From Swiss-Prot:
Keyword ATP-binding in record: no
Record-given protein name: Mediator of RNA polymerase II transcription subunit 18
Lineage: Eukaryota, Fungi, Dikarya, Ascomycota, Saccharomycotina
Pfam families xref list: Med18
Subcellular location per the Swiss-Prot or TrEMBL entry: Nucleus
Main location: nucleus
UniProt entry keywords in alphabetical sequence: Activator, Coiled coil, Nucleus, Transcription, Transcription regulation
Function: Component of the Mediator complex, a coactivator involved in the regulated transcription of nearly all RNA polymerase II-dependent genes. Mediator functions as a bridge to convey information from gene-specific regulatory proteins to the basal RNA polymerase II transcription machinery. Mediator is recruited to promoters by direct interactions with regulatory proteins and serves as a scaffold for the assembly of a functional preinitiation complex with RNA polymerase II and the general transcription factors.
Subunit and interaction comment: Component of the Mediator complex.
Membrane-crossing residue ranges in chain numbering: none
Entry's Gene Ontology cellular component terms: core mediator complex; mediator complex
Species: Yarrowia lipolytica (strain CLIB 122 / E 150)
GO molecular function: transcription coregulator activity
Length: 231
């Protein structure tokens, strides 16, 4: 899958007017989202010997494992770190329907949007943590994305903030004390080789950017911010 995207930041004071404007633009009420993401990394770094005449390098990537638990309130949120103290919690957490993603670096060069290759799959049944451990991966860290989502044509518009576990209260708290919101507008294209669909997605995002101009400035972040490779 190839994901075409643009990003912006808005202050907490701008949220209400942005939600109102997006509801008017899309013709829908915002959907509340709450996503729990865990990042797993290889337990050992793999450094293959590159023989003379062999080009390229073999990179190892972190795996992002995401579960949509928007129907749960904060009291029901189960942290991987906390769940290790409870067999029931770790079992319930491991057997949720997790979505796996390996994300490559976005394309380099002068681009109108961020274009990133993503390999994704889901584990609908069974222990996802045992599966990851069988791949020689280990848990690294976790976070939660809370916010709102709209759909406009083929584009998904998300306004979210990152939360992390508060070790004192055992609830989740905002990571960024400035309380800013991250806006992500994206379109998923099935295949990198589908040039027509990719071009159409880029044009559609450019249209969204123009329509939201004055409300927010959608742009391309530094591609290094997307680097999930093991160094």
């Amino acid at each position: 899958m190839q994901q075409i995207s643009l990003y912006a930041k808005i202050s907490n004071s701008q949220l209400k007017i942005c939600l109102h404007a997006l509801a008017s633009l899309t013709g829908m009420d915002p959907i509340t989202i709450l996503q729990h993401t865990m990042v797993w990394a290889p337990a050992q770094k793999y450094t293959p010997k590159i023989l003379p005449g062999q080009g390229g390098q073999l990179d190892q990537y972190r795996i992002h494992v995401t579960n949509d638990n928007k129907n749960e309130d904060k009291e029901k949120i189960i942290s991987y770190v906390q769940s290790k103290d409870s067999k029931e919690d770790i079992h319930n957490l491991a057997n949720r329907q997790w979505h796996f993603q390996i994300m490559e670096m976005p394309e380099a060069g002068k681009q109108k949007t961020t274009s990133q290759s993503i390999s994704s799959w889901s584990v609908k049944k069974g222990d996802s943590f045992q599966f990851l451990q069988s791949l020689a991966y280990k848990f690294q860290y976790e976070y939660w994305q809370k916010g709102f989502q709209f759909v406009y044509g083929n584009a998904v518009i998300q306004l979210t903030r990152i939360h992390i576990l508060d070790q004192t209260t055992k609830n989740i708290k905002l990571l960024d004390p400035s309380k800013q919101w991250l806006v992500k507008v994206y379109i998923d294209v099935g295949h990198l080789t589908d040039i027509e669909a990719l071009n159409k997605a880029v044009k559609e995002l450019e249209k969204v950017k123009t329509e939201l101009h004055g409300l927010m400035n959608l742009e391309i972040p530094d591609r290094n911010a997307f680097d999930t490779r093991i160094r």
